């Protein structure tokens, strides 16, 4: 998916519609 411009070292993405995969990068669901 597309990058969300957010990292998720805690395993949580705060950007709506994004998931922490592959860690530690948030990508669009």
Swiss-Prot record:
Coiled-coil segments on the chain, per record: none
Cross-linked sites for Cyclopeptide (Gly-Asn): 1-29
Gene Ontology biological process terms, A to Z: defense response
A Pfam family it matches: Cyclotide
Record PTM: This is a cyclic peptide.
Main function: Probably participates in a plant defense mechanism.
Entry's family note: Belongs to the cyclotide family. Moebius subfamily.
Name of the protein in question: Chassatide C1
